[in-house]
Amino acid sequence: MLFFVNDYCEGAHPAILQKLLETNMEKLSGYGTDKYCDSAKEKIRKACGCPDADVFFLVGGTQTNATIIGSVLNRYEGVLAAQTGHVSCHEAGAIEYTGHKVLTLPAENGKIKAESITDYVETFYGDESHDHMVFPGMVYISHPTEYGTLYTKKELEEISEVCHKYELPLFLDGARLGYGLVSPEADVTLEDIARCTDVFYICLLYTSPSPRDLST
């Protein structure tokens, strides 16, 4: 059975497990500050074509989404996302818990259009009482979407252009990014995503025992 929920529900590649075994007894500084993390950061920057990019390591998609959105937005701002988007439907109020509202946009097969962002922003600022409303502060998309659909390079560039026009940071959820990048129908590369977005993340495969595993 093929399982496409996200990129981190599979076990680790045997070569990764072997390397973990080989380095297990090394004494290193805290996670994120050791030589292996430094090496990983450089490899990620090279793959993205962004030599000056900041790279951080977090655990789990929901935590990452909440951390990024909570860090980018001002207290009076919300995040624009598809009405079918992951942060809109499937994160159990994690974004709202940070004090920010998810401002939903109409979606077509899970995707939002640049025109929808323009319409929302223009309508918002055209309302004389907008000072009493939640301001649009950033845009969230995922690739693939909740429906498994992919943004084309043209669509991504159009969304990026609108976001720059209105000074809205563009955030791409990468929980399923690996599937999107290797799809035979995709024309978007990792470098395209790095160029068009302000922040995105890449999920890495890992193995983590569940409580049930520990009890057996």
What are these regions (language model features)?
Residues 206-216:
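Single conserved hydrophobic/aromatic residue that forms the stacking wall/gate
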Residues 151-183:
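Catalytic PLP-binding core of fold-type I/II PLP enzymes
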Residues 186-204:
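Conserved active-site segment immediately N-terminal to the catalytic lysine
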Residues 13-61, 83-88, 94:
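Conserved N-terminal alpha-helix of the aminotransferase class I/II PLP-enzyme fold
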Residues 71-89, 118:
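Conserved PLP-anchoring active-site segment centered on the Schiff-base-forming lysine
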Residues 99-146, 151-158:
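PLP-dependent aminotransferase-class I/II
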Residues 52-73, 103-110:
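Conserved core of the PLP fold type I
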